[in-house]
């Protein structure tokens, strides 16, 4: 099931990059959690499925453009680790990027949690893995 989970995450990130929240969340469980508790920004917290669309709309709406590039997928049983770079362009034309890693947790073929980590190493260590 791991490769299927990777494809679900890849499809969700592609949909996120298009701004299609419904498609992004189409393979999530009703109890899905978007865990930004390790964020260093003002969006720190854990968001339930009902809150995620508004969170993304507010966050993406602060920029002229937002795009996430995937660097790597790591299959880990019911989890998928994704290292990525988020590219943003502000209203004044200033561009920035930030690296992060995500752990997507799956149960019965749907995502139940997406947890953000500052680095791929942090994400792997949270799962008891090493590079």
Can you describe what each PLM-predicted range is?
Residues 22-78:
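A solvent-exposed, acidic/Ser-Thr-rich amphipathic alpha-helical stretch
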Residues 86-88, 106:
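Hydrophobic beta-strand positions in extracellular immunoglobulin-like domains
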Residues 102-125:
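Short beta-strand edge/turn micro-motifs at domain boundaries
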């Amino acid at each position: 099931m791991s490769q299927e989970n990777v494809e679900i995450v890849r499809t969700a990130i592609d949909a996120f990059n298009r701004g299609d929240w419904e498609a992004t969340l189409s393979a999530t469980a009703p109890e899905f959690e978007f865990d930004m508790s390790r964020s260093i920004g003002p969006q720190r917290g854990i968001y339930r499925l009902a809150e995620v669309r508004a969170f993304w709309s507010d966050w993406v709406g602060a920029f002229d453009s937002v795009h996430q590039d995937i660097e790597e997928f790591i299959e880990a049983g019911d989890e998928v680790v994704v290292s990525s770079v988020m590219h943003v362009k502000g209203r004044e034309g200033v561009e920035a990027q930030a690296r992060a890693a995500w752990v997507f947790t799956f149960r019965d073929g749907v995502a139940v949690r997406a947890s953000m980590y500052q680095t791929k190493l942090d994400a792997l260590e949270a799962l008891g893995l090493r590079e």
